[in-house]
């Protein structure tokens, strides 16, 4: 089986070139070599969502793409990845967390629509996937994390105990995140909540106490 750490190291080097298409071509190539692992599936999922969103923003800004069909390349690959992931890795924690993250914020990540997940059924997918996560990983804090972060529920973050924060760090640590952009985006997502969200929760509580006094 292809080594996901080696793949991420290759992606990291390609990202330093500042171009998207080389990363896409590399991921497409390794995707086709053998049945993709959960790690590769998650990486390709993240990367294509990020690229489709970025190219979409370029369109709004009127800036050029790297290729005339760049959006379609990423979108088609993204849908292939989602299909494979839902078929093979729906019960796996890392893939399940990532797809839950996207369906929870589907108004932003509508790029996932097209095959299994559509605008018409996304709310049902959201309900089903979070229920499956609760059933399969009842002790995990990571799936609870998603809706509270999306709602900027600072109070929830502030009320977490030190033991719960430690659990979150340990769970994220299981993913062995690397230096590539997508892994760093996930790390930043959790780090921000552990600092900025928690600090805002403290400030809101202090303000509330002052008002009550």
Stretch-by-stretch model annotation:
Residues 62-73, 106-118:
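Surface-exposed cleft-lining segments at the edges of enzyme active sites
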Residues 13-28, 67-80, 119-124, 163-168:
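Helix-turn-helix repeat elements of alpha-solenoid scaffolds
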Residues 27, 33-34, 82-85, 89, ...:
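Alpha-helical junction/boundary sensor with strong preference for TPR arrays
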Residues 2-9, 33-64, 90-110, 138-159, ...:
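Amphipathic alpha-helical repeat scaffolds of TPR domains
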């Amino acid at each position: 089986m292809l080594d996901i750490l080696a793949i991420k190291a290759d992606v990291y080097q390609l990202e330093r070139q500042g171009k998207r298409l080389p990363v896409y071509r590399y991921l497409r190539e390794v995707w086709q070599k053998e049945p993709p692992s959960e790690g590769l599936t998650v990486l390709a999922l993240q990367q294509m969502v990020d690229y489709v969103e970025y190219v979409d923003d370029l369109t709004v800004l009127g800036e050029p793409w790297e290729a005339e069909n760049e959006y379609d390349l990423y979108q088609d690959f993204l849908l292939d990845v989602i299909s494979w992931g839902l078929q093979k890795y729906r019960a796996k924690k890392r893939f399940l967390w990532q797809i839950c993250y996207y369906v929870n914020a589907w108004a932003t990540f509508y790029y996932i629509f097209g095959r299994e997940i559509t605008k018409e059924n996304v709310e049902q997918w959201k309900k089903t996937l979070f229920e499956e996560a609760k059933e399969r990983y009842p002790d995990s804090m990571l799936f609870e994390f998603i809706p509270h972060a999306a709602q900027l529920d600072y109070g929830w973050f502030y009320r977490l105990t030190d033991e719960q924060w430690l659990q979150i760090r340990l769970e994220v640590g299981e993913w062995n995140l690397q230096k590539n952009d997508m892994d760093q985006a996930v790390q930043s997502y959790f780090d921000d909540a552990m600092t900025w969200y928690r600090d805002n929760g403290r400030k809101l509580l202090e303000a509330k106490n002052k008002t009550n006094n």
